[in-house]
UniProtKB/Swiss-Prot annotation:
Xref: Pfam families: Antimicrobial_1 (PF08018)
Cross-referenced InterPro entries: Antimicrobial_frog_1
Tree of life domain: Eukaryota
Entry protein name: Brevinin-1BYc
GO cellular component: extracellular region
Cell location: Secreted
Species of provenance: Rana boylii
Cystine crosslinks: 18-24
Summary of the function given for this chain in its UniProt record: Antibacterial activity against Gram-positive bacterium S.aureus. Weak antifungal activity against C.albicans.
Family of this protein: Belongs to the frog skin active peptide (FSAP) family. Brevinin subfamily.
Tissue: Expressed by the skin glands.
Length: 24
């Protein structure tokens, strides 16, 4: 697992959840 992908998932994951659940 690439560190770059890990960092991307860590930064984009919460944002995607925020947009999907509309709980920002």
């Amino acid at each position: 697992f690439l560190p770059i992908l890990a960092s991307l998932a860590a930064t984009l994951g919460p944002k995607l959840l925020c947009l999907i659940t509309k709980k920002c």
